[in-house]
From Swiss-Prot:
Protein source organism: Cupriavidus pinatubonensis (strain JMP 134 / LMG 1197) (Cupriavidus necator (strain JMP 134))
Name of one Pfam family that matches: TsaD
Recorded name of the encoding gene: tsaD
SUPFAM superfamilies: Actin-like ATPase domain
Protein location: Cytoplasm
Cofactor(s) needed by this chain: Fe(2+)
Gene3D superfamilies: 3.30.420.40
Protein name, entry field: tRNA N6-adenosine threonylcarbamoyltransferase
InterPro entries: ATPase_NBD, Gcp-like_dom, KAE1/TsaD, TsaD
Amino acid sequence: MLVLGIESSCDETGLALYDTEAGLLSHALHSQIAMHRDYGGVVPELASRDHIRRVLPLLQQVLDEAGRSRADIDAIAFTQGPGLAGALLVGASVANALGFALNVPMVGVHHLEGHLLSPLLTREPPPFPFIALLVSGGHTQLMEVKGIGDYTLLGETLDDAAGEAFDKTAKLLGLGYPGGPEVSRLAEFGTPGAFDLPRPMLHSGNLDFSFAGLKTAVLTQTRKLANTCEQDRANLARAFVDAIVDVLAAKSFAALKQTGHKRLVVAGGVGANRQLRERLNQLGKQRKIDVYYPDLAFCTDNGAMIALAGAMRLQAAPDLAQHSYGYGVTPRWDLADIRLPSAA
């Protein structure tokens, strides 16, 4: 089965072709970072208009790279939510038009389910069950994953997500957009321990997160350093990243201990952070836990993860198109709420 995946939830237009026997055949991505940089963040109307311009040329690109035609497509998966409503509607509209024209099934995919399953695109994919640390944009969650569509929420952020804290800290430090990678790069030059920042909810006794207080602590430090030199900024960035990593690592391994699972999957944009990967790998080696990550190319939003998630859903429930969530979009959508028809 050849599945076309379409991702358009925010500021990346991603398309991919995934074959259930041969694996990922091709993928293409256009990022809008340069367009939004002058505004310091994503402008929804501009994002939607750019998706419209990019989606069909990218479709032709993935078909050409895979040596396939539109007639070869057996099913279409698109990001149904969560995300920006206008941006989501672009992908959903293209999926609908192609689906009806080709008379093939369509399936709406949860954006975070795509991230959660993205490590399965690697050469050594993790088997079920596992614990997933999802750190993507406005989401920071710990999920117990027993199989496709079988997800239990163990913990989540009570205020700012880790990605949001990165972006806000970048602004406080006078860094560019997007903030996360800029903070991580600056932190590489920082001295560990130069600043003492809090580890919110580190000893809360549950698996929830909170990063608003950490952001406030960074704000307090920047105000104390009115004439901040470059090394001070690097040291503060390092202290911030270390605090985030400490909390994410501690909560992840607490979830593993609580459930008894021996596999940890890390997905989403922050999952590309080098310091986080090093800490989790170190703890995994010490505690005999296997840690899995997506390829760096698939940490950001992409069509490959949507094609894979759609293919896995259609394989698990062949009549899914008849039991679909509908062909609209769901800008607000909890991952723990989705189920396969047989599990509903």
